[in-house]
């Protein structure tokens, strides 16, 4: 009886079909802000994929100050150009040219994104502005000291 059980187990338990992984590999990106030289408009973005291939988006603006990934978007603060650029992230990198939002000469610096709103600090205007990511309008300005 044991021999019969072991024989059946071996016949049923073995498969000649190899296991195939049908999942697609999704490209993941690391984004690096390259500030550039003040006044030279040569700030850039480096993109590194999960194969360690490096790509560059040149001449993004004058002083690429900071950036952040939020959902399927890359949000880039460009200080001396006084703009924020928003790019869609795709499998191939960034969808260019992106959307450019003027900050009205505020010299934006750092950002954080909460609930589809970008809160960014400003050197010239000494405030925190709030950018709505649905309509790309600056909704409000919050004065701060310093």
What residue ranges belong to the model's regions?
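N-terminal hydrophobic targeting signals that begin at the initiator methionine
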Residues: 1-2, 15
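Sec-dependent N-terminal signal peptides
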Residues: 4-12
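Predominantly soluble domains enriched in secretory-pathway, periplasmic, or organellar proteins
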Residues: 14-146
């Amino acid at each position: 009886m044991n021999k019969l059980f072991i024989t059946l187990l071996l016949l049923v338990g073995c498969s000649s079909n190899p296991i195939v992984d049908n999942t697609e590999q999704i490209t993941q990106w690391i984004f690096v802000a390259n500030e550039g030289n003040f006044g030279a408009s040569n700030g850039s973005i480096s993109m590194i994929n999960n194969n360690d291939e490096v790509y560059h988006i040149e001449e993004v603006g004058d002083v690429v100050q900071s950036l952040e990934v939020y959902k399927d978007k890359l949000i880039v603060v460009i200080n001396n150009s006084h703009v924020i650029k928003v790019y869609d992230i795709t499998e191939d990198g960034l969808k260019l040219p992106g959307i450019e939002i003027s900050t009205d000469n505020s010299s934006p610096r750092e950002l954080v994104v909460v609930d589809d709103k970008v809160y960014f600090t400003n050197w010239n205007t000494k405030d925190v502005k709030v950018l709505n990511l649905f309509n790309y309008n600056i909704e409000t300005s919050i004065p701060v000291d310093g």
